[in-house]
Amino acid sequence: MSATHDPQTVARWSVGGGFLEALANRNFEALAGTLAPGVRFRAMLPPGPMDWEGADTVSDVFGSWFGQADDFELIDATVGEVGGRLHLSWRLRVRPAPFDIGDGWHVIEQQAYANAGDTIESLDLLCSGFHAEQRSA
């Protein structure tokens, strides 16, 4: 099956890939560069809903979650589209987890939907929270 993509779709997918690449490299300055200056970021987190605005503020939020880990691994990431909205997902392993959760490996998965063109204008995220990694025997 083949598909043709209009320039807007290509731009959305490109900025989504840039966001994930910046996250994977923990390059929060580059991550901010994928965001519109007035980006709105709404997140459903384990403690409850949160809302932030502005590219630097949003980048700082991601830095607070992932920037301090000694060990950081991107396990999986995807870029897609749902009804004209960009869909991004990623699963990470970090050690230690932030917020004094624990020193061992923790896994986190996040799903995000974005309105995007050349930059991400709004980002709605659902977060699994940080969970101690369970190794099978």
How does the language model describe each region?
Residues M1-G33, P37, A137:
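Short, low-complexity N-terminal intrinsically disordered segments enriched in polar/charged residues
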Residues S2-P7, D60-A137:
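A beta-strand edge to alpha-helix "cap/lid" segment located at domain peripheries
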Residues A11, V15, T57, W105:
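Soluble or luminal CAZymes and related metallo-dependent hydrolases
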Residues R12-S14, M50, D100:
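Compositionally biased, low-complexity repeat tracts
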Residues F19-A22, A30, T34, M44, ...:
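Acidic/proline-rich low-complexity IDRs
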Residues L23, R40-F41, G104:
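Short hydrophobic/aromatic segments of transmembrane alpha-helices and their interfaces
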Residues A30, T34-G83:
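A solvent-exposed, acidic/Ser-Thr-rich amphipathic alpha-helical stretch
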